[in-house]
């Protein structure tokens, strides 16, 4: 068995996430406590937002990003408590989930990652005024077709619209100015594809995020990542980091660049991975992975029951 640990991104959050694991596993509780200390200036502890809400506060990007990190790393801590000998061959995360992967790899301390994600979330939210940007999921068209339609819509409107997430075959999320995204959706319909708006607070992973990338770059300049204990596959190119010297570059590029999740999954499969463990709220990545590789073995861990199921399956696997 060759295992990959994968970590979700924004959109997976829900009130109550991590609460049951933290109540049952001291190792998980310690993760939330550490993130609360890292963000000690918060008027309400981040763990309280995760466990109790309100949803309006949890879904603010500046809170969502460190909250999903905390929950994902808490799930990892609980899994390690149950199966300390289970060693992943490779790690990856979707968008902000890449920070969770870097924590799991030993490259970033948890407290540093939490503060970086607070800054990242704040900067991404502030990069574009409310209502100016939009995102839309395009279904049923090949990646290169969607890229071409984005280019057409951008030329026709003189505005920004780009492929932002290559999630799985037949699903690409685009981001940019709201009017350019609307034009893209018209072009998608003309080509026989479907599209739907993605309810987000800003157009992530497109050129409109360049101001946020610059702010993150300044923060990362002051950080010296540790060597990676486990390989991490980067979102921006679907290739392993290689070494910690690229952490700053790759995380900065990721803010305004596309998340190439399909390529990340293919890279892990090509590295011999036959089992994926999704650590964090929801099961979004499990669905995407199975669309990249039909029949892929994926175990999602988000609460004590799903942890029990994953431990049982992983313990029985050859």
Report each predicted region and the residues it spans.
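FabD-like malonyl-/acyl-CoA
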Residues: 1-147, 275-305
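Short, low-complexity, intrinsically disordered N-terminal peptides in bacterial proteins
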Residues: 1-3, 315-318
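Alpha/beta catalytic cores of group-transfer enzymes, especially the acyltransferase/condensing modules
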Residues: 11-12, 37-42, 105-257
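Short, solvent-exposed amphipathic alpha-helical segments in soluble enzyme
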Residues: 23, 152-154, 189-190, 286, ...
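Short hydrophobic/charged patches on amphipathic alpha-helices used for structural packing
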Residues: 262-266
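Non-catalytic positions within long, well-ordered alpha-helices that form the structural scaffold/packing
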Residues: 269-272
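Short, charged, surface-exposed secondary-structure boundary motifs
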Residues: 307-313
């Amino acid at each position: 068995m060759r295992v990959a640990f994968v970590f979700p991104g924004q959109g997976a959050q829900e009130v109550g996430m991590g609460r049951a694991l933290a109540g049952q596993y001291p190792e998980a509780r310690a993760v939330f406590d550490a993130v609360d200390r890292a963000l000690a200036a918060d008027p309400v502890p981040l763990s309280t937002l995760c466990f109790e809400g309100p949803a309006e506060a949890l879904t603010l990007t500046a809170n969502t990003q460190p909250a999903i990190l905390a929950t994902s790393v808490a799930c990892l801590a609980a899994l390690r408590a149950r199966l300390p000998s289970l060693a992943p061959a490779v790690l990856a995360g979707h968008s902000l989930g890449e920070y969770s992967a870097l924590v799991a790899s030993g490259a970033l301390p948890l407290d540093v990652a939490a503060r970086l994600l607070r800054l990242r979330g704040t900067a991404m939210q502030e990069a574009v005024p409310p209502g100016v940007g939009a995102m839309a999921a395009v279904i049923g068209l090949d990646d290169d077709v969607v890229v071409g339609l984005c280019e057409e819509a951008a030329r026709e409107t003189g505005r920004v619209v780009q492929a932002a997430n290559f999630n799985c075959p037949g699903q690409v999320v685009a981001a940019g100015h709201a009017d350019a995204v609307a034009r893209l959706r018209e072009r998608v319909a003309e080509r026989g594809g479907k599209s739907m708006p993605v309810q987000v607070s800003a157009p992530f992973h497109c050129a409109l995020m360049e101001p946020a990338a610059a702010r993150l770059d300044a923060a990362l300049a002051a950080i010296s990542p540790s060597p990676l204990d486990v390989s991490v596959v980067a979102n921006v190119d679907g290739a392993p980091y290689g070494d910690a010297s690229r952490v700053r570059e790759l995380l900065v590029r990721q803010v305004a660049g596309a998340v190439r999740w399909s390529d990340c999954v293919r890279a892990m499969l090509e590295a011999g991975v036959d089992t994926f463990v999704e650590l964090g709220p929801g099961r979004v990545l499990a669905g995407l992975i199975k669309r990249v590789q039909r029949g892929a073995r994926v175990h999602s861990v988000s609460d004590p029951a799903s942890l029990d199921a994953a431990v049982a399956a992983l313990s029985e696997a050859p």
